[in-house]
């Protein structure tokens, strides 16, 4: 009997944790690969940073954020057998983009025409995009992104965890090396 309660308690705790960390909207992970591209790439390097600002001071010139994204991508690509190089031309160039926007969700328990007991929730959602560009042809060969991410920029530990998780989910969508 206690084993059943313990299992049910664990399951309920897990659901609570997942619900609490998932934000107001479901997180979506997507990827596109250029058709016909054989992923025989062995090396990669980081492309130069964008000079275009996002307009969000939480992201623009935020070295903590960009360094964490780069470290997470480096770790995930190394786990897939890609070697990071600094000097010679690389097989792939890696680039990332990030945005944070506000969304409004209106919730009501009333299903009729008037909105009684309505409440609106304003929350931030983030999108993180990772691009892989063929180093020889300069063509985009793969793009992966996560959207509806709950961006936690003002807490370093949460930011690092969120970025690590998001990058891992994105890189899982990469085609296998051939």
Whereabouts are the PLM-identified features?
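Bacterial N-terminal signal peptides that target proteins for export
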Residues: 1-13
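A structural "domain/chain start" motif
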Residues: 2, 22-75, 79, 89, ...
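Bacterial N-terminal signal peptides
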Residues: 11-21
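C-terminal/domain-edge helix-coil "capping" segments
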Residues: 25-39, 123-127, 132-178
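Surface-exposed short loop/turn segments
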Residues: 27-28, 80, 88-141, 147
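Extracytoplasmic/periplasmic, Sec-exported soluble proteins
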Residues: 38, 57-69, 86, 120-124, ...
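Extracytoplasmic/secreted cell-surface and envelope-processing proteins
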Residues: 55-56, 103-105, 152-154
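Sec-exported extracytoplasmic/periplasmic mature domains
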Residues: 74-82, 102, 137, 171-176
């Amino acid at each position: 009997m206690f084993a059943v309660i313990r299992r049910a308690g664990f399951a309920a705790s897990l659901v609570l944790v997942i619900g609490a960390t998932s934000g107001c909207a479901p997180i979506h992970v997507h990827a596109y690969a250029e058709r016909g591209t054989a992923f025989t790439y062995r090396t990669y390097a980081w492309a130069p940073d964008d000079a275009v600002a996002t307009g969000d001071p939480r992201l623009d010139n935020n070295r903590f954020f960009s360094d964490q994204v780069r470290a997470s991508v480096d770790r995930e690509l190394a786990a897939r057998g890609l070697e990071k190089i600094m000097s010679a031309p690389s097989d792939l160039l890696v680039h990332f983009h990030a945005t944070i926007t506000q969304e409004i969700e209106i919730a009501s328990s009333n299903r009729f025409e008037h909105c009684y007991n309505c409440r609106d929730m304003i929350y931030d959602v983030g999108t993180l995009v990772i691009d892989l560009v063929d180093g020889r042809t300069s063509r985009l060969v793969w793009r992966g992104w996560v959207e509806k991410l709950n961006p936690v920029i003002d807490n370093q530990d949460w930011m690092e965890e969120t970025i690590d998780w998001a990058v891992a989910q994105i890189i899982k969508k990469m085609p296998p090396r051939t």
